[in-house]
């Protein structure tokens, strides 16, 4: 056609036709590039989805390990309190090997990092929908993980120092080691009457219970939050997410907050801390005002569209005791109280 137009001296039409061909070629190239870019993006999205599935798998595995870790140390804490408060008798030590070994054994908490390391390698390809999840994930694998590793090391070193001190100074310890820790009178007398033993037990409580156990609980709360946020980014509802992980995180009761008529703070007598997820669907930051177990006033911020507080520590309420929800101007939106062991609250 172009040749025919040139032969007939129709130069204007020739150039129009040529330009049209060029435009069509350019459009074709752009379409091809768009399709190629789309295909590449699909590949990246699939890869990122796989990476987050690995992160979720790691988190679930670590939550299960944290559950065992928490159970172990909560039982140990009850034994330590008996020892510190002088509630243990000779007979108790004779019959209960766990009482005799509150200082001698410990557990470490290990966190899987494979998924997180892979995520860091592909961080530039992560879609913005995962922004909320990344906040928790980065906190877990930097700040919290560092605390866990420090606690693991401190606990291990304390045990080594304490057992070496006992081996150097007490014949009963060397004898008990040779007889598979069979209790003897000197051992039990040391546990009952030596003030240095109480010091050893208190140090164990500080490192293993106050530090290690507390950090494990923070890890669990943040890990659950990260799981939920990954699911929310993929259009999985909060209800579906919590149900899917029920075996690992326990059951949650779904209720709406209902104001109570009176609001009178009373010091709880039977403390029962309640881990709480609060879903703030208001279009502004909200604040939860309440008293903790020690009667201290606390104000916890909840960003809009958040499902847990923007604080490092976990959020715990006392069962059947009230708290206030305030807006960003300090106006009270209502007074509420918990009614179940586990609660999921809608703020709306």
PLM feature spans:
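Long, hydrophobic alpha-helical segments that serve as membrane-spanning/inserting helices
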Residues: 1-12, 16, 37-255
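Intrinsically disordered, low-complexity Pro/Gly/Ser/Thr-rich segments with frequent PxxP/GP/PP motifs
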Residues: 296-320
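Short, surface-exposed ligand- or partner-binding patches at beta-edge/loop junctions that are enriched
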Residues: 319-331
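Asparagine-centered strand-capping/turn motif at beta-strand->loop junctions
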Residues: 267, 275-282
């Amino acid at each position: 056609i172009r040749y025919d137009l040139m032969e007939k001296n129709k130069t204007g039409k020739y150039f129009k036709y040529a330009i049209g061909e060029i435009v069509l070629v350019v459009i074709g190239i752009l379409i091809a590039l768009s399709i190629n870019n789309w295909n590449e993006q699909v590949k990246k999205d699939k890869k990122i989805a796989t990476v987050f599935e690995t992160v979720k798998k790691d988190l679930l595995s670590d939550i299960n390990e944290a559950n065992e870790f928490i159970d172990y140390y909560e039982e140990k804490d009850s034994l330590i309190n008996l020892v510190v408060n002088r509630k243990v008798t000779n007979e108790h030590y004779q019959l209960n090997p766990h009482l005799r070994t509150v200082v001698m054994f410990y557990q470490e908490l290990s966190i899987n990092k494979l998924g997180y390391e892979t995520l860091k390698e592909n961080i530039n390809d992560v879609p913005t929908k995962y922004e909320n999840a990344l906040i928790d994930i980065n906190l877990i694998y930097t700040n919290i993980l560092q605390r866990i590793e420090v606690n693991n090391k401190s606990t291990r070193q304390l045990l080594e120092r304490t057992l070496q001190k006992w081996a150097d100074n007490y014949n009963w310890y060397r004898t008990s080691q040779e007889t598979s820790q069979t209790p003897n009178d000197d051992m039990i007398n040391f546990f009952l009457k030596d003030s240095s033993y109480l010091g050893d037990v208190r140090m164990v409580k500080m490192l293993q219970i106050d530090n290690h156990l507390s950090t494990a609980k923070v890890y669990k709360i943040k890990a659950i939050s990260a799981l939920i946020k990954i699911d929310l980014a993929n259009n999985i509802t909060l209800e579906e997410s919590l149900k899917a992980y029920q075996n690992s995180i326990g059951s949650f009761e779904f209720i709406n907050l209902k104001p109570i008529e009176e609001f009178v703070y009373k010091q709880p007598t039977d403390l029962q801390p309640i881990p709480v997820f609060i879903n703030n669907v208001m279009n502004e930051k909200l604040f939860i005002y309440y008293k903790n177990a020690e009667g201290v006033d606390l104000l916890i911020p909840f960003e809009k569209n958040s499902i847990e507080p923007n604080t490092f520590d976990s959020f715990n309420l006392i069962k059947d005791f009230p708290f206030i929800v305030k807006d960003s101007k300090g106006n009270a939106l209502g007074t509420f109280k918990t009614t179940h062991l586990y609660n999921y609250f809608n703020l709306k």
